[in-house]
């Protein structure tokens, strides 16, 4: 069975990379595609079968030592959702569904939305998220029933028989019509989820300062744009994360890099930062590999091939090294490890290139994930900036008895640097060994030894390269 073999191979691929979280896309499904799909599965019998299948999938994934976090979109729904039913999917179903709020004023879901006019039947005067009529915004403040329902959803999926391991919350700061209610809701949501499953993680999507939500009573952590994706992208590529802008003054600028990282890390707090979702790419932004070609634009104007041209794998490997050695939870967007390119949504949601993967990048990701797994200090150790110059950064991860040093040269020239690694607790004449190096043309995991002099590491760096060294283990 080809479908069984496909699923088996996919699970094996994900398992091989399971130390880094893998973000799986929902694909490029616009409203028309979603509507077509719902027409096939809207029967209650099919929905029950789908839930049972999902519970089994989670069980199988857990048996393989992996975890599952599901996406909760609680700020808005689709216009095709049964609560709104603008496309008349449920009203035309053979099953007995209540009418949607779009269709009739008397709909039991009327209070779930904010309407501005009285034009029933088929009232299109509802509030859409950011004005999108395909994404009706939910109106919690005027519907206790809606709030209770979503809190029940929060409990349901982290409980038996589904037992998922947490929630990723879509545009979480936008929920509700006031900041006060937003905080009130997420406090209730946290209590509901943690009572059902104390180990379930609550991970929010938010752009900007998340300090107020990360005080221990709402979100556990966030998708880390401000203290990871953006500073890494600016430093290594000079590009904005949608590929909408190129800023030469940010490219190779260590002051901006460390300044942005440290300021935003401090705003998050240690516990939240230690488990933050550190991504290079995702379903809302251009692929990191595409950002390395410095092409500004989107697929509608440039076409998909422009995203593939003149990409720089050496810069991409630098980024992956940072991702796997920086504090936080490294999260791979499916296909990045195989060399998938793409401009921002929808081009970033290309299918996985089965049989056409970049084999070198696959091997590299396996090795760099193995490095992350085998060096506990990279997961739980302290962090310190050690060195900076134009195009060059160095930092350390360390504990009472271990240390790892990371050095990146994003420039077009070879350089020699002298780094005060004694600040990580290494002895003044300690021995360290290189455990990974990336460069133009590939990477190596061959070992190479260095001896510190007066607590400093003197090392030559190839152009567009990254080096990872650790305390020599006798």
Predicted regions span which residues?
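Aromatic- and carboxylate-lined catalytic core of secreted/periplasmic carbohydrate-active enzymes
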Residues: 353-386
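Single conserved hydrophobic/aromatic residue that forms the stacking wall/gate
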Residues: 1-14
